[in-house]
Amino acid sequence: VERTIKGIVVAGTHSGVGKTTMSLGLMAALRCRGLAVAPFKVGPDFIDPGHHAKVTGRAGRNLDGWMLSREANRDLFARHAAGADVAVVEGVMGLYDGYGGGDEAGSTAQMAKWLGLPVLLVVSAAGMARSAAALVQGFERFDPALAFAGVLFNRLGSRGHLDYLREAMSAYVDAPLLGGLLRDEALAMPERHLGLMTAGEHALSEAACHRLADHIESGLDLDRLLADLPDIVPADVEPVGCSISCFERVRIGVARDEAFCFYYPDNLDLLAAAGAELVTFSPLADNRLPEGLHGLYIGGGYPELHAAELAANDAMRRDILEASRAGMPVYAECGGFMYLCRELEDLAGEVHAMCGCFPFRTRMHGRLTSLGYREVRMTGPTILGGKDEVARGHEFHYSDIVDRHQWSPIATAYQVSGRSGGLAAEGYQVDRTLGSYVHLHFVSRPDCAAALVSSCRACRRERDQEEG
């Protein structure tokens, strides 16, 4: 008998309606009922999937209509929904918001149709009554091909407010009204400059998860939602496993702490499948790199918030610089790239010493300096692949390089274009150390993971020859 699961996409009419809180609450309520929940997030965001993982006990996975193809998204969904009872997909922005005004590309609606899942539409009822029915009717009719599981009102002023909304909805909207939740600011997730606080900074306690679950159960007809969701059979996918012999396996150190926490789990899975043993370490707390490494992966995060502590850890900075100079492959993205540079200047103008693998100083600004999807074409051989190989990712940061022009001998490794085109030189490689502001999703080019592991394997062989 084929195992079936149920799946739902949680979407909002627009950003700020409480979509993340509702998604987390739904995941928590389902788990409190004893159901295994597979969490997903539409878009390139790192923070929401971290909270999903805290609530569900399963890694939060990203689905994305630009970084990844339709087939890749469907494959990831099938692979990571397998074994769960319910898959919950948190949308991005408003339901129909995508890359442009002319079509659905990149939208939550597009992803829902790609996956064949119905939508639970979250609507903020604050300041609205009968007008809410007009709003929902517009969303319902905008794309007849999209299936709606129901509507959930958030931020009700009172239970009487919900009665008013129910009367209006029954007259004008086909999608079932599955409930409404009273305004509760205590449940809002705290934010900082890159969005919500990370799961590491604002860890949801077991008590907080139960509060979220109780909040959802108090106003959402979860029994009806589950009963009405169709049973789906996840598509068969090839298992991701490692067939590399132990003699060819390599150890890659992955930086994991409050300063470096932004990784797509699928990137790590692909590295493991290519033959890497992943060993976590903390540039903040550890004095030395783990023993026996053949490569390093330093992801993004918030080095600017921990710059003094990172600078004070001289031993770790020295270890990383020596590993880089010795030819160990080192790959760093965004915050990790900032850490590999010579210095980091914070918002107060204070300059902190970093690793020095690259000669640059990066400077924090009080505004975004870059945001958007990126396509990377490699201009020559790199530790992620050869000349003209292409991968996709995302860029989102408040810093930049302040002295790039002084270091013209440092060649760029990428030609980077945005979703709408335009080329810029970016990415920096010195020997086998590669750093960039772009967060790549390796599923857009799985060969990147294989190439990085291959570079680490070459490092291992060189070391073995020196020692032998």
Which sequence ranges carry the predicted segments?
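Residues that mark the start of a beta-strand
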Residues: 7, 35-38, 249-251, 277, ...
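A short helix->loop->beta-strand "cap" motif at the edges of active sites that frequently abuts
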Residues: 117, 175, 325-329
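C-terminal and late-domain segments of enzyme folds
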Residues: 112, 247-248, 260-272, 277-279, ...
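Cysteine-nucleophile active-site neighborhood
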Residues: 303-383
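Beta-strand->loop->alpha-helix junctions that form or flank phosphate-binding loops
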Residues: 41-42, 177-185, 277-285
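Internal gly/pro-rich beta-alpha loop/helix module
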Residues: 129-244
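Phosphate-binding active sites in nucleotide-utilizing proteins
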Residues: 249-325
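ATP-dependent carboxylate-amine ligase catalytic core
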Residues: 2-115, 119, 123-150, 159-163
